[in-house]
Amino acid sequence: MIDFSKTITDFRSHVPGIRDWAYFETGSTGLVPDFVYEGVRRYMDDRYYKGGDSLWAYEDETVSTLFMHQRSKEALAEMVHCKPSEIAFGLSSTQLFTLVTEGIDYAEDDNIVTVRKGWIGSRFAWQKREAEGLEIRYVEPEDGRMTAERIAARCDEHTRAVSVNLVESNTGYRLDMDALGRFCAEKNILLYVDGVQALGALEVNVEKWNVDFLVGNDYKWMMNFCGTGYAYMSPKVQKRIRHWGAGWMSDKDRFNTAKDRLDLRADAGRFEIGHQHNDGIYGLGLVAMQNNLLGLSNIESYVCGLADYFCGRVEETEGIRLSYDFPRKNRCQIVVVKLEKSLQVSEKDFEEAKVCAPIGSLDENGEREMRISLHYYNNREDIDRFFAVLKKGV
């Protein structure tokens, strides 16, 4: 019943939004594949016309809502290399991230090490704690680079946690998680990771990297509608989070309304509290299943190959250059470029060519920046269409 794609090249046919447009804005908001749209619509139609808790369809069976939650957790767990019991759902990646900023009691002499110019969601969450007296140590990037060594240099015996972004949203810099994970494990420092700009496009292995806490969302690389986040929580972190709220979804026996006392679940689901955004959880699970079917190593190789092709076109094109020159191991599916002052091209030119690639404002040098996001529904022809627009402005 779910029409998954068997190959990466065939997947493009499942995304109507890419049929007419060359779409490069997934780093902001991704496109939605047909099997997510149709699956959610089936549920909506059943709720609208029939009422009740309608069933969720899969290739092999239809299941009720709580079983659907479990199947989505199983797919996401396979995608990030953890156990389904270590996955929890929430309103967003940022809301879930506050479980470790607000839910863990840090001692008076503890400090947290994080990135100065990282994504504002987690950075603002730490700044709130900083205003309340917790010491937050910021690591300055150098030419857009944030190495494990620079982060380690800011840590000491009082560092309780390191908080990073796997891929930096504004630069496309990919952190060396092997090195950082080893350091944190050796020093017994908790490792918190925002994986939003990587999950669904790159290989992520929380076990190999010694990650303690990881958050992701639904509407970028996971190709869903907005409103659902998910988190991996290691058993160590689950034990340390102070449970400041509970509800019927937190209980071991979720439909026993005759119970007098709460009996908290032993897994990460105890943090879910109440009814979740079921459409989003279903869609997340479907995309995780699609990713697992294709293989994240194959997906990463494909999207990074597109990025290499894009960078090669940049080198041979006048009026455009790469904003950052990162080592290969730190590159990913996001490429940031500068449009030089001499290049006469506008967003209208891109729109008329049906190329979705927003242009930033003029900087002090009269140049404009563009962030190009390459998903596995993109191909080289999309990239060629982008450069055909630039060629007219030279």
State where each predicted segment sits:
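Pyridoxal 5′-phosphate
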Residues: 1-394
